[in-house]
């Protein structure tokens, strides 16, 4: 099983909470296994959105999970950072207030926290 790097809740905005998780992957099957592993934790299984992007040897994949455009935000940040053979998952628990365009900034903030963690280590 692929080892997950789960940073937990890294920020909140107007009641919504965001967490970020990632793992090394080399195939779509690996991505699916990581998502399944993450969702074995009840909080993540019940999250409003688990958006993700992956850079694989065969190309890029992404999924918005109802948070339109969020997968592309994650993917572009991964591509700019040169992060390959990886999946990054940004989880949101909706807090009752719509965030509008700020939701993309929060996805960026969560993704940046993960990328920074990879650069600096635990």
Language-model-derived ranges and their functions:
Residues 1-68, 78, 116, 120:
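C-terminal regulatory domains involved in ligand/effector binding and gene-expression control
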Residues 69-71, 84, 92-122:
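Active-site-proximal loop/helix of nucleotide/amide-processing enzymes and allied scaffolds
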Residues 72, 76:
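Short, contiguous clusters of charged residues that form electrostatic/catalytic patches at enzyme active sites
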Residues 77-84:
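Short glycine/proline-enriched loop/turn "hinge" motifs that connect secondary-structure elements
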């Amino acid at each position: 099983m692929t080892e997950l790097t789960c940073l937990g809740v890294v920020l909140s905005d107007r009641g919504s909470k965001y967490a970020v998780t990632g793992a090394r992957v080399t195939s779509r099957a690996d991505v699916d296994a990581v998502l399944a592993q993450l969702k074995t934790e009840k909080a993540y299984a019940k999250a409003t959105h688990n958006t993700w992007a992956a850079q694989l040897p065969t190309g890029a994949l992404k999924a918005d999970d109802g948070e339109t455009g969020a997968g592309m935000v994650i993917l572009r940040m991964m591509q700019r950072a040169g992060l390959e053979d990886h999946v990054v998952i940004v989880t949101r628990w909706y807090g009752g207030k719509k965030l509008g365009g700020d939701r993309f900034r929060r996805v960026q903030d969560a993704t940046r926290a993960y990328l920074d963690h990879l650069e600096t280590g635990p």
